[in-house]
A protein has these predicted regions:
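Extracytoplasmic
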Residues: 33-61, 65
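Residue-level signature of mid-helix packing/kink "hotspots" within the transmembrane helices
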Residues: 50, 78-86, 170-171
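Extracellular/periplasmic helix-loop-helix junction of adjacent transmembrane segments
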Residues: 55-82
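Membrane-interface helix termini in secondary transporters
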Residues: 58, 89-90, 179
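Conserved MFS/SLC helix-loop-helix module at the cytosolic interface between two early adjacent transmembrane helices
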Residues: 83-119
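Short hydrophobic/alpha-helical segments at membrane-entry points of transmembrane helices
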Residues: 120-128
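Cytoplasmic helix-loop-helix junction between adjacent transmembrane helices
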Residues: 127-164
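Glycine-rich segments within core transmembrane alpha-helices of 12-TM secondary carriers
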Residues: 160-175
Length: 180
């Protein structure tokens, strides 16, 4: 357990650079890399959250779940997501953000795969609640990243760019579903 906790911590400090142009070039490269990683990374989180929206009608038409059961399942995701955002926000401040988000996205992907093999209401409900928890590991680290890499004067612009990740995720979900 201790190894797992150490793995998720931030890394050691890198050696200091003294060449101003090298520092500026590296800083701008890293900033842009982090920004686009959190934009597309959080967009992919949305794919794992919206899959049930695409599957609701076929599941109801097939008699697998009714509207009430789907409502309960959806509510469970949002309750665990909300509680997870509260707790994971604190954890994200102290964690290696790349590993933190990757863990959340990886487990969410596994839960989404398992969702396809479930046929009972309680199976769907438990898996979707777990998905909500791990989905909550995306937003807080993304916000922390933007806050850490951009000045207070720049943040509004870059938060606006990050906000497009919702649309990217929705677009990819519906395009992917239409393709399949």
């Amino acid at each position: 357990m201790n190894k797992l906790l150490k793995w998720r911590k931030t890394g050691k400090d890198k050696p200091s650079l003294s060449d101003e142009s090298q520092i500026k070039t590296l800083f701008n490269y890293k900033r842009n890399s982090v920004l686009w990683s959190v934009v597309f990374g959080y967009g992919i989180f949305y794919i794992g959250r919206l899959t049930i929206s695409v599957a609701k009608k076929p599941m109801m038409d097939a008699g697998i779940l009714d509207a009430t059961e789907l409502g309960i399942i959806g509510a469970l995701l949002f309750y665990t997501y909300a509680f997870g955002k509260l707790t994971n926000g604190f954890l994200a401040d102290r964690a290696n953000i790349a590993k933190f988000m990757s863990t959340g996205l990886g487990v969410s992907a596994i839960v989404n795969l398992l969702f396809g093999f479930t046929t009972t209401f309680w199976g769907f409900a438990i898996l979707w609640a777990i998905n909500g928890w791990f989905q909550s590991m995306g937003s807080a680290p993304a916000v922390v990243s933007v806050t850490q890499w951009f000045s207070s004067e720049e943040r509004g612009t870059y938060y606006g760019i990050w906000a497009a990740s919702h649309n990217i995720g929705e677009g990819l979900t519906f395009i992917g579903t239409a393709t399949v």
